[in-house]
């Protein structure tokens, strides 16, 4: 399964030391998994894979997963979520900004039998934006936007672009800078 994360960024000790972390589907829990699979990430180095998983008594080479429905063109009909557990701050700090992906979205969930659903969400931490990742390597997003606007204005003035196209391009550029560094639907 191709996953929207970086093993080196988020599971550094798995990559470097073969440490195993609990991983399981957190989506479609009412349906038993029907497939076995391994996980690969979206990074360019082809080194981001998880092919060892915690089992009841030992480890295993595959993870029980669900089939993910697609349309007739192979496009996913809905997202499929996996939980990576017990990673902690050390993994975040050591992974730093590898590949400029930055931090993934994170949810801190605690089990509590006194809660109606048996758990509560303590905190939701949003992942790194493209603008924040670029800022970490000294690119100012306001300056990038200013330069893009100048290029669009020149293209419009030279009749290479229509004003509506220019506005759409600038809107999309701004949305890209404020968007998540990982893939989004």
Per-range role (PLM):
Residues 1-185:
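Charged (often Lys/Glu-rich) extended helix/loop segments that serve as interaction or gating elements
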């Amino acid at each position: 399964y191709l996953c929207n994360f970086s093993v080196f960024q988020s599971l550094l000790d798995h990559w470097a030391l073969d440490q195993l972390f609990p991983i399981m589907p957190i989506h479609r829990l009412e349906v038993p998994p029907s497939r076995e699979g391994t996980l690969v990430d979206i990074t360019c180095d082809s080194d981001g894979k998880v092919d060892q998983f915690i089992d009841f008594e030992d480890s295993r080479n595959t993870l029980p997963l669900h089939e993910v429905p697609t349309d007739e063109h192979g496009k996913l009909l809905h997202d499929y979520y996996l939980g990576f557990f017990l990673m902690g701050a050390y993994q975040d700090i050591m992974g730093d900004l590898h590949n400029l992906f930055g931090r993934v979205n994170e949810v801190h969930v605690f089990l509590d039998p006194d809660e109606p659903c048996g758990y509560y969400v303590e905190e939701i931490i949003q992942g790194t934006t493209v603008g924040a990742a670029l800022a970490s390597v000294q690119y100012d997003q306001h300056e990038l936007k200013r330069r893009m606007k100048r290029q669009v204005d020149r293209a419009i003035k030279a009749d290479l672009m229509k004003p509506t196209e220019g506005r759409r391009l600038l809107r999309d550029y701004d949305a890209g800078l404020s968007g998540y560094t990982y893939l989004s639907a």
